[in-house]
């Protein structure tokens, strides 16, 4: 299984901390960037072939990780035009002819530690086209929202600064 990591966002909500000189996934936790921790979790789960979709400040990510060999990974990059971002799903369009098998898709600024093999087993057992892992949060007004019923996604609402609840 391969992994695709979306790392092209501007990180506007955290720009006071990043100073718009490093992308949000490069913020450090315990001495390493969030993105490093994600990649090491993928490696722990046997996933070493990773495509990173970069955009705003993507050069910082490329300079740090390179081709991934020093981390025991095989990293490739797809560059999204930072002036014309396509959004989370839109950026996957770049990969429509490149990845034909199941893959894990992660947002680069989310710090998670899950068993991807179990998630893939669930995906296959349910004959799913897409398996989506979500979590509740305390700030729905500035987050993407997924409306589900009985384990089936019914709607997706992109974050909007106009939403108050």
Task: Identify what each model region corresponds to.
Residues 28, 77-79, 132, 155:
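Structural signal for conserved beta-strand scaffold positions within catalytic alpha/beta enzyme cores
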């Amino acid at each position: 299984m391969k992994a695709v990591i979306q790392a092209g966002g501007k990180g506007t909500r955290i720009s006071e901390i990043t100073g718009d000189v490093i992308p949000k996934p490069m913020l450090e936790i315990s001495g390493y960037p969030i993105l490093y921790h994600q990649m090491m979790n993928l490696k722990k789960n046997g996933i070493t072939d990773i495509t990173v979709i970069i955009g705003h400040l993507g050069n910082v990510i490329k300079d740090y990780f390179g081709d991934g060999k020093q981390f025991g990974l095989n990293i490739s990059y797809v560059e999204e035009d930072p002036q014309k971002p396509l959004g989370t799903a839109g950026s996957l369009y770049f990969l429509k002819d490149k990845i034909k098998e199941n893959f894990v898709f992660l947002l680069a600024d989310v710090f998670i530690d899950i068993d991807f093999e179990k998630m893939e087993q669930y995906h296959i057992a349910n004959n799913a086209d897409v398996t989506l892992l979500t979590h509740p949060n305390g700030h729905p007004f500035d987050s993407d929202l997924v409306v589900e019923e009985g384990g089936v996604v019914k709607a997706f609402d992109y974050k909007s600064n106009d939403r108050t609840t």
